[in-house]
Amino acid sequence: MRFVALVLVVLLSGCINPTTEEGRVFTIETLDRVEDAGSVYSMKDNLSEGPVLVLFIGVGCIGCKDWTDDLREHHNDWMDQEPPLQIVSVERYLRFETKEDVAEEFGFPESNHYTPWPIVLPTDDDSIQRIEDQANLSQSVFEYYGLPGTPELFLIDQEGVIRWESSTYYPDQNSIEEIENAYKKVI
């Protein structure tokens, strides 16, 4: 009996398709600045242009401010690449930090840590979506990304799949190189 089961497993093992991760995206309210390109950010629309680097931020997070400043130094060069490496900052603690707090810290050229890319403001109720049809799924955006702390970064390929992540609190001398290497692997 065991022999028959073993033979069946061996013979049928090639018949099973490996599971591939399905892409996920989000559509979320922004600060509605010029840099946000509208009041709602669609990751699916942005992925049609190129990969997206997601940075979870908080107003009181020192590491988030350091990451923002480091990423800002490379943002224009990354946007000039083909395809561009886009960035979106995701406010993590909207229950405790107001939209105005986020705008003051990150939203304006005169802000301490100006962010020249979209900033989105998800709530705990905003759902992650399937990339094909943008249907809302049962997980929230935060749940899908593993209830991230701040700062936390994820590189999303053009299929909506997470291909790299970093939970390093402060960027170091290798951080930008890591991001650029991950980008090269997904294009």
Region annotations inferred by a language model:
Residues V59, R92-Y93, D124-D125, Q158-E159, ...:
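Solvent-exposed coil/turn segments that connect beta secondary-structure elements
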Residues K44, T68-H75, A103, F142, ...:
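Extracytoplasmic/secreted envelope proteins and their assembly/folding machinery
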Residues M1-E21:
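Secretory targeting signatures
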Residues I28-V52:
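A short beta-strand-turn-helix
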Residues S138-Y144, P148-I187:
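Thiol-/selenol-based redox modules, centered on thioredoxin-like
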Residues K65-P116, V120-R130:
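Structural microenvironment flanking redox-active thiols in thiol-disulfide oxidoreductases
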